[in-house]
Structure formats: C-alpha cells, structure tokens
C-alpha cells in the first residue's frame, strides 16, 4: 500500500476528505495536500516506526557486506543508524563473528595488536551520514568478505507512491488511534476499542511473520 493510500485509509475512518491524486515530492512541501492531511501523514510515520520496533520483520532484513583490507580494523557498514544485527559471517570460512565490548577491543591493542582472521566485532562510531562503523578483532591481514545480516527500519514515508514494507493494518489502525487522541473525539468508535484493535492487529502480524523464522532459535552443528 502506498503512502497516499495509507493516509486515505485513516482519513476515511475519520470521515475526512481523502487525497484524490498523488502529490509531487515531499508531502510537507506540497500545496495540494491540506494541513490536516499532512498531520495524518506524520501520524502514519509515527505508527510505522512503532510497529517496526515490535519485531524483526522479514521484509526489513538485508545483508551488508564489507571487504577487509590488510592492516585496517575499522569499517563502515553503510547501514544507517537504526539497525539491529542478526548474524555476522566470514564468507571465506563460514565462521561466525561474535560481538564484544569496546573495552575488550581496547584490551587487545596493547602491547601489540593481534592480526589474522577476524573473530570479533564491536561498534565504533559513525560517519557524517550516521552510518555505523565497526572494529574487527583480530585486525585483518588479508582480503576477506564479512556479511552483516541486519534489520533496518524503512525511511520515513514522504512521497505519495512510496510503498510501506511492513504489514499495513497495524500501521493504519495505529495512526487512526493517534488521530482520534490528537483531536480528542471521533464521534464514533470508542478509543478503547481502537487501542484493542491496534494491539490485536500487531499481535496477529507478528505471529504470521514469526512462523517463517521459527528455526532461528535452534543451533546446528556442522
């Protein structure tokens, strides 16, 4: 469902005028979208972020790969800031890298640095675009590819045709609940009923998505 369609789903529930055609560019810069419709757009994004944080949604998962350089410890994930790491694998060996603290990484630097195949990683800063960086330990001494499987929130919806990645129902209901709360009344559905519908829709969506990753908690011996 597109951003415009999501906004209209909420507007219909509020018995407000819907947006007939796609606007151009960022919704907040549009002269064809009313101020109230823009408010609903903001509430859609608030609800989206809330639902995204409930669960490691499959549609939000992706892999970031870095290629090591001999003698270089710090690498940019080019991932943005709001991510969760699921798994880190050395493609050359199949070995899993374990997350450790910055204190541990610091303890390995003296009196001399370790070099070799990376076995550990720790977050260490970000670039000017808020992309997170990691340090590898031992410091690589050859070219290898390290895969980082992550969960990454979708950017805020701004353009009319941008499609929502996660399940739509809990996002729409969540935005509706926020809109009713924002203006204090709805003249229809009780706010308690809406809140209950929001909770139930999120639970159902999580149950369905979790069924496709039910083996993630199991361990396999190679």
Spans of features found by a protein language model:
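Glycine-enriched, solvent-exposed interface loops adjoining structured elements
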Residues: 1-222
